[in-house]
């Protein structure tokens, strides 16, 4: 932002955030509307002199619990058309917490499910109690203050940018593998069609926990390595990835954040079907592992 280099206070990205002691007695501005931004704003609000949450665009906010259960454990049957599920969940959110703009937050410019929602059980409560003040996007900074696009400004001591992440693979040469604009084409978010036997576990963003999906991916790769699963042909992989990318572009708001987005239940359902299809291909191939197992060169000690 213009003037950021003149700001006398502290600036950091959410990646560097550890705990809320950095906000103690200070005036903080948190930029972002994702999970990190709202979690950090809530933590700031308990110790900071003032906390401002600046939003670049609106998001749908989900409570952490609905009907006594974690929100990501709500049944989301992939056999039901997405449009039907979308309307039901959006109506439920509106009846449960109301529209975000009621709290002074920006209005989402998309329907529920077209962008990654934010899950927070405390943000709306802290806003209603006046310990967090919503603001629009930042326009500029000067030595002691932050100016917003609506013309208002506040004195600030620290600014935290919760503005997303860049996918990179520093352990690979860029000409071997990279993710420009966070875009990397993988079959079911795990297998690269042109780079055999390199696997990506957990490189996705679900609505829900990553760990159960990563565990399912790991089991899938395990089946592949011992020969119990066989991939489709490279041409089929490329075609499937292209279809998946096209569906993603139709479904989600264009954003670097959504290049690895998946629906938790839909993904696991599709993965289960693919593992079954791959098991049949492996059976027809004689359950041959993809990597030849060679005898060890070691000899027994005398």
Where are the predicted features?
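PP2C/PPM-type serine/threonine phosphatase catalytic domain
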Residues: 73-76
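Flavin (primarily FAD) cofactor-binding/catalytic cores of flavoenzymes
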Residues: 1-65, 78-234, 249-302
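Short low-complexity, flexible loop/linker segments enriched in glycine and/or proline
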Residues: 67-70
């Amino acid at each position: 932002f213009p003037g950021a280099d003149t700001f006398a206070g502290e600036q950091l990205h959410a990646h560097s955030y550890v705990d809320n002691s950095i906000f103690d007695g200070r005036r903080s501005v948190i930029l972002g509307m994702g999970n990190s931004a709202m979690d950090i704003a809530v933590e700031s609000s308990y110790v900071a002199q003032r906390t401002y949450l600046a939003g670049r665009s609106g998001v749908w906010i989900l409570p952490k619990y609905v009907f006594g259960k974690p929100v990501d454990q709500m049944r989301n049957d992939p056999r039901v058309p997405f449009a039907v599920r979308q309307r039901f969940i959006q109506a439920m959110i509106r009846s449960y917490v109301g529209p975000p703009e009621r709290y002074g937050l920006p209005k989402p410019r998309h329907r529920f499910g077209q962008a990654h929602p934010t899950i927070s059980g405390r943000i709306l409560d802290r806003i209603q109690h006046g310990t967090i003040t919503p603001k629009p996007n930042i326009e500029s900074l000067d030595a002691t203050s932050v100016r917003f696009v609506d013309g208002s400004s506040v004195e600030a001591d620290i600014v935290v940018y919760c503005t997303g992440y860049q996918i990179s693979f520093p352990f690979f040469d860029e000409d071997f593998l990279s993710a420009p604009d966070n875009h990397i084409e993988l079959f079911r978010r795990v297998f690269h069609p042109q780079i055999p036997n390199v696997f990506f576990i957990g490189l996705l963003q679900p609505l829900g926990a990553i760990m159960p999906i990563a565990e399912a991916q790991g089991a899938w790769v395990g089946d592949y390595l011992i020969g119990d699963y066989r991939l489709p042909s490279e041409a089929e992989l490329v075609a499937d990835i292209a279809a998946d990318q096209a569906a993603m572009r139709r479904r989600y708001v264009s954003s670097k954040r959504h290049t690895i987005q998946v629906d938790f239940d839909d993904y696991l359902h599709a993965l289960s079907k693919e593992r079954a299809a791959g098991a049949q291909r492996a059976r027809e191939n004689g359950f041959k592992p993809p990597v030849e197992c060679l005898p060890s060169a070691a000899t027994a000690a005398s």
